[in-house]
Amino acid sequence: MPEDAIGQQVPPEQEAAGAEPTSAARERHATLSLELTEHQYRYYVLDAPTISDAEFDERLRELAALEAEFPALRTPDSPTQRVGGAFSTDFTPVAHAERMMSLDNAFTDEELDAWAERVERDAGGPVPYLCELKVDGLAINLTYERGRLVRAATRGDGRTGEDVTANVRSIRDVPAELAPSAEFPEIPGLLEVRGEIYFPIAGFADLNAGLVEQGKAPFANPRNAAAGSLRQKDPRITASRPLRLVVHGIGARQGWQPSTQSESYAALRAWGLPTSDRWRVVPDLAGVAEYIAHYATHRHDVEHEIDGVVVKVDPVSIQGRLGSTSRAPRWAIAFKYPPEEVNTRLLDIDVNVGRTGRVTPFAVLEPVRVAGSTVALATLHNAREVRRKGVLIGDTVVIRKAGDVIPEVLGPVVELRPPDARSFVMPSTCPCCGTPLAPAKEGDVDIRCPNTRSCPAQLRERVFHLAGRGAFDIEVLGYKGAAALLDAQIITDEGDLFALDAAQLTRSPFFVNKDGSLGSNAVKLLDNLTVAKERELWRVLVALSIRHVGPTAAQALARHFRSIEAIDQAGEEELSAVDGVGPTIAASVREWFAVAWHREVVRKWAEAGVRMTEEAVDEGPRPLEGMTVVVTGTLAGFSRDQAAEAIQSRGGKVTGSVSKKTAFVVVGENPGTKADKAASLKVPVLDEEGFRVLLDAGPDAAREVARVED
């Protein structure tokens, strides 16, 4: 949840200024205060919020704006002045030795710049900043006396929290005793360590699935799972959950005064406490902006949820000079990313039939704005996943949309479940053709429509697929064009596509003008089909919709066998032996060619003039033969497909993961965690210039310019 603080700091001299509040302002202030107090209680005590963090922030900012306009409305118990909340709970209250403060928030670059200007003005000049990820978890205060853990407490209202020592002791990351190190041999007699307990994203779905199986309510998101798992009356339940800790600050201490925030992190890690590997000290605000921009595009490479970046003045002496407000330090701020999670209503669950017959449920949502776009649909993967998530039709659900990733339903807000909410029932017959649905083989999670040749949904998806850039690249034949051909019954399956003529196309309104003459769409389609007949063999293989055969496997098959006939005649063992193919793809190829109507499609295309062979050409040297290369980040001179094709044409193999067997990792702008993995495994790393050396001069020359971490 939000930090319960606002990005705007009101100077003391303005506190008493302002007009007399209007009756409307007083009424709105009272309403917002009550709402926010209720939501704080649901968040901090019940671990069951009913609104998203973004909605809370929006209401809190509205309340702060009212108080800025009418200072008389601001009281000490206002939600804008509180840290967390002082609510009665089942845990014993315990006082913090030093107050756990909140953070002011910046939601825009301008707000961050304004904060930095104030800092540098009061500090007397530029200062170095420490940047770290803002973990979306549960704030915790660990108290060590003479190196031994004596107490763990939640933040509470900042002065008094809840004693959760027994539960925290069960978390594997929390050391019961701190160990001196060579660099930091003296452990303070008293040390308060501040951190965040989080639930790893990777384990969240499994936790909810287990709760649903036990008939218990699932959690809406990993943050709620962390809070709910920690605040259990039985520590054994906490111990059974994979909670993790990351520390990010210190409170009261005796006998130790670090000179910088970064030095304190080094000491905490040396004593055995888990600090983040992702914090950085930067010299100026430009460095802060780079850090924020990097994690804005790589926030999903992190093992836990984050909702922003915390920026701190690094020198402790300047922190002391800047001081604090009643709620938050002036030397730190949280830059909040636009929300990727919002709450909305699940109106229905429908199903989609894909090109391979897979039947996939998807959520029909009340449209909501998230991550820069309006979302009305979200994936649910399969019927088992719907059960695992514990969502019912009619629920308020939490959805996440990360950049270009398909929106996903995380889980339900069970507290808002209406009495008429109902379970989803997976259909037993195909919604498009009525054929009984079944798994492709025993034990499959997915169910499929076996009417592969004639099911309208599958055929439409296959035609759309074969027209894509990774296959025949037929520009006019988009989703509407594919549907138009089928709706007018111009083709019975994809085998008829390359025999199309102008007379056939006039049967569809999509391909004709108002006067009945042939439209530009039809002319372009016929021209595109003529060009597509000469596409490379590997593109033909991709266009056939053979399961598991994408561009990489298709290129390997085309390069090795040179013709569709040779691939058809090859046995499974021979196919499997091709580098880049393997047993799964080999079995899929054999299964595909064993179907009579599949072979009929190939025959029709060949008769229509589609090229079914790969001309034997002198490929030239293959200097990367047997080598595996990983590409991460954005390259200025290559698209991802172009980079892969350049590697493969020289005999190399492109993979998506880094291992000790990886020959090179090519790193562009905004690389992901693969660059870090390469460094840890000491795999040679190339920038784009080094990549060109690899392509032009070979691996030996590339090793000369590669970077290998010591």
Curated annotation (Swiss-Prot):
GO molecular function: DNA binding; DNA ligase (NAD+) activity; metal ion binding
Keywords in alphabetical order: DNA damage, DNA repair, DNA replication, Ligase, Magnesium, Manganese, Metal-binding, NAD, Zinc
Cofactors, names only: Mg(2+); Mn(2+)
Residues engaged in binding Zn(2+): 430, 433, 449, 455
Class of enzymatic activity (EC top level): ligase
Binding site for NAD(+): 53-57, 102-103, 132, 155, 196, 312, 336
GO biological process: DNA repair; DNA replication
Family: Belongs to the NAD-dependent DNA ligase family. LigA subfamily.
Function field: DNA ligase that catalyzes the formation of phosphodiester linkages between 5'-phosphoryl and 3'-hydroxyl groups in double-stranded DNA using NAD as a coenzyme and as the energy source for the reaction. It is essential for DNA replication and repair of damaged DNA.
Record protein name field: DNA ligase
Organism of provenance: Salinispora arenicola (strain CNS-205)
Upper lineage: Bacteria, Bacillati, Actinomycetota, Actinomycetes, Micromonosporales
